[in-house]
Amino acid sequence: MKPSIYAFSQANLVDWILENGEKKFRATQIWEWLYRSRVQSFAEMTNLPKSLIEKLEEHFVVNPLKQRIVQESKDGTIKYLFELPDGMLIETVLMHQHYGLSVCVTTQVGCNIGCTFCASGLIPKQRDLTSGEIVAQIMLVQKYLDERNQNERVSHIVVMGIGEPLDNYDNVMTFLRVVNDDKGLAIGARHITVSTSGLAPKIREFAREGVQVNLAVSLHAPNNDLRSSIMRINRKFPIEVLFEAIEDYIKVTNRRVTFEYIMLNEVNDGVEQAQELADLTKNIRKLSYINLIPYNPVSEHDQYSRSTKERTLAFFDVLKKNGVNCVVRQEHGTDIDAACGQLRSNTLKKDREKARARIAAAKAKAGIRA
C-alpha cells in the first residue's frame, strides 16, 4: 500500500526530492500544487517533468481516503465518514462557528482510553492514522468547500475526533506542521486545538515542542474516584499527576489550558462537584478555561443521559461565583449522528447486518437447491 504524500512535511519532501536526484525547487512546486492548487493527482502538476511525475506515482498516492457518507445538519454542521485504504472507517466533522469554519479530525481507528460514556471507544483501537491520513481529512473537507464555490476556507482545526491524539504523537506533530506551514494551508497555530484525555508525560513533551497550538484536556470529573470510574486513563495518570503536568505545560508555554467537561445527569453535574472543580483549578485560574459540554446520548451507554438545563445552570453558576472562566459549549449537529464515533459505529452495525443478511440469503438459496 503506497503512503500518501500528505505525510511529508515540507522539509521531508525536500529531503525526498534531493535523495531522488531532483532539484530542490521541485519540492516547492509540488507543495504548492498540493496545498495551494489542491490537485488530487500527480498528473495535474503540469510544470513537473514526466519523469518526476512517474516517480511520484510509483511511490505515493495523493489522497488515501474514500468518502463513504456525508450527513448535513440543519445548523450547517457536516459529518463525513471516510474509508481508509485498508477498509477501516473514520469520522471528520465540519462546524460553522461565529469565528470561521472549524474541522474536527480523527487520529486513530478506534480508541483504547475506555471512557464509559463515549461512542469512540465502542470499538478498541485498531491502529494509528498516518500523518497523511490525518492531513487528508482536512484536504477532502476543503475540496468539498471548494466545490461549493462560496469562497469558504477551513480556518480552525480541533484534534478531538476518534482516538487519543497524544497516543499517536509523532504523526499528530507532523500533521500540525503540515497544516500550519505558511506556504501551504497556513492555518494559524493559535487556530488549532489538540485534545488529550490526560497522558501526563506527553503533555510535558508537548509543552517543549515550541508550537503555539492550544491544548484541551478532557477532564469530566473533579476527583479521582469519579474520574477513574468513567475514564480508565485516570487509573494510570490520576488527577494529581495530570495537574502536575498541566502546571508544567503552563509554566513552559505561558499558554491557557481548556478543560472539557461533559455534563452527565446526576453523575458529575452536582453543585458539590462544581465546587470541587473550582477548587481543583484554583491555582491555574488565570490560564485555564472550562467548557461545559451537553452530552450526546449513545445507545450503548444508556446508563448516562444529558444533564437538565437546571442542573447545568446551577453548575455553571457555582463556577462563575468562584471566578472561573467557563462557558456552556454551543451544540452542533444534534439532528445527525452527533456524538463522536456514532456515525462510524452505526455504519459498522448496518454493514454487519447487511453481511448477515447476505449470508442468510446464500444459505437459504443453497437449501432450496439442495
UniProtKB/Swiss-Prot annotation:
It catalyses: adenosine(2503) in 23S rRNA + 2 reduced [2Fe-2S]-[ferredoxin] + 2 S-adenosyl-L-methionine = 2-methyladenosine(2503) in 23S rRNA + 5'-deoxyadenosine + L-methionine + 2 oxidized [2Fe-2S]-[ferredoxin] + S-adenosyl-L-homocysteine; adenosine(37) in tRNA + 2 reduced [2Fe-2S]-[ferredoxin] + 2 S-adenosyl-L-methionine = 2-methyladenosine(37) in tRNA + 5'-deoxyadenosine + L-methionine + 2 oxidized [2Fe-2S]-[ferredoxin] + S-adenosyl-L-homocysteine. [4Fe-4S] cluster binds at residues 111, 115, 118. It is found in: Cytoplasm. Its EC number is 2.1.1.192. Binds 1 [4Fe-4S] cluster. The cluster is coordinated with 3 cysteines and an exchangeable S-adenosyl-L-methionine. Reaction proceeds by a ping-pong mechanism involving intermediate methylation of a conserved cysteine residue. Specifically methylates position 2 of adenine 2503 in 23S rRNA and position 2 of adenine 37 in tRNAs. Belongs to the radical SAM superfamily. RlmN family. This is Probable dual-specificity RNA methyltransferase RlmN. It comes from Streptococcus suis (strain 98HAH33). The lineage of its organism: Bacteria, Bacillati, Bacillota, Bacilli, Lactobacillales. The gene is rlmN.
